[in-house]
């Protein structure tokens, strides 16, 4: 039999050398670690400032919270009202509702997302449970995009980019506006 010195013999020699120096368990362990790491990759935090508009994007440069947010306790229809520190949507105050109730013709979603907001009036921090009002067309007035304390989608209870209308009465999946009731003191 003639000795082959070509490509096949080099690959065979490499395979035999690798097999003699490494174990199957080590390979399977590394492969398992790679697969688990690949599966966990989507759970890493994501910087989503690039999808925001120009002025909003410029306001968030260098920080994930909105730069210059000064909470006030005078006008509940303003985006800077202290309860709206992490709201992303239309204020129900401007759409026929109140801070704690939906406008007529819309229904309250059973789901909520939470945030802690600072009230400059009494210098306390409160837990706010934002809830969407659903079932009517989007109000379109008093639209606020506040991202203070918002976390990526893998922590949905602290994310304000999700439309929380699933589970609303009568399959009312259309977002209308958002209320911001106080749950209690945060500290």
Curated annotation (Swiss-Prot):
InterPro entries: Amine_DH_Ltc, MADH/AADH_L_sf, MADH/AADH_Ltc_C_dom, MeN_DH_Ltc
Keyword annotations: Disulfide bond, Electron transport, Oxidoreductase, Periplasm, Signal, Transport, TTQ
Domain of life where this protein originates: Bacteria
Any Gene Ontology CC annotation: outer membrane-bounded periplasmic space
Covalent link location (Tryptophan tryptophylquinone (Trp-Trp)): 113-164
Molecular function per GO: aliphatic amine dehydrogenase activity; methylamine dehydrogenase (amicyanin) activity
GO biological process, one term: amine metabolic process
Protein location: Periplasm
Family matches, as Pfam families: Me-amine-dh_L
Positions of modified residues (Tryptophylquinone): 113
EC number: 1.4.9.1
Signal peptide: 1-57
Cofactor, free-text remark: Uses a protein-derived tryptophan tryptophylquinone (TTQ) cofactor.
Disulfide bonds: 79-144, 85-117, 92-177, 94-142, 102-133, 134-165
Cofactor(s) required, per the database record: tryptophan tryptophylquinone residue
UniProt family annotation: Belongs to the aromatic amine dehydrogenase light chain family.
Biological function: Methylamine dehydrogenase carries out the oxidation of methylamine. Electrons are passed from methylamine dehydrogenase to amicyanin.
Name assigned to this protein: Methylamine dehydrogenase light chain
Source organism: Methylophilus methylotrophus (Bacterium W3A1)
Gene from which the chain derives: mauA
